[in-house]
Amino acid sequence: MKTNSTLKLSCILTIVFWINGCGGPKAFQKGEYDDPTRVELLDDKFNEADMQQMADTIVKAMVACPYVAKAPKPPVVIVEQVQNRTEEHIDMVSMTDMIRTALIKTAKVKFVNKPERGTLEEEYKYNESGVVSGPTQKKRGNQIGADYILSGAMATNVQEVGKDKFIYYKLTMNMTNMETSTIDCTEEKQVRKYFEKKRISN
């Protein structure tokens, strides 16, 4: 009888330890660097591969646009954050930064830094305060006016039929002439993805 009780207790303790081991807190403890250019669809959300595809297409089109390619000197552009017209949370700041950075690297366009206007105004006041030596003072009136506004929006359409899901993204970007208000350059990039709903196994 004592042997049976000991055996039962041993089994119970084993089960308890097993449950605690399975249900306890877990953490990612080992990692490695991955290739950022590799496309890997882990879920049905917008990802960095989608963003890169769109940015590459937009940049190539804007640089090839005749108003940019044939300009006597690089046009000056001010960029507005890309609008998110989807129901998904997408980092539009990163999208906008990626496009602007790639365009600057082409040396075909220049950008004025709109977000830093407040900081620049503070620096002008500081330069005029008398603590900065004359030859190194930076004065108002020398900033370059923008020739174009670069703006755009992301839209999406989702279709689900049974276990099948299709997601369609479209990014449209325009370069608007500051003087004439005409859209001189425009491009859109479409990304369509298919997913199949499957049972999640433990």
Residue ranges and their predicted role:
Residues 83, 115, 179:
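Short, flexible active-site-adjacent loop segments at beta-strand->alpha-helix junctions, enriched
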Residues 16-19, 71, 143:
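Alpha-helix termination/capping residues and helix-transition junctions
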Residues 96-98, 106, 111-161:
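Short, solvent-exposed, polar/charged sequence segments at loop or secondary-structure edges
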Residues 66-71, 140, 161-163:
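Surface-exposed acidic, glycine-flexible loop patches that form ligand/cofactor-binding
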Residues 1-20:
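Sec-dependent bacterial lipoprotein signal peptides
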Residues 130-131, 197-202:
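Short, surface-exposed secondary-structure junctions/capping segments
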Residues 23-108, 200-202:
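A structural "domain/chain start" motif
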Residues 23-30, 147-199:
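Amphipathic beta-strand/beta-sheet edge segments enriched in Tyr/Trp
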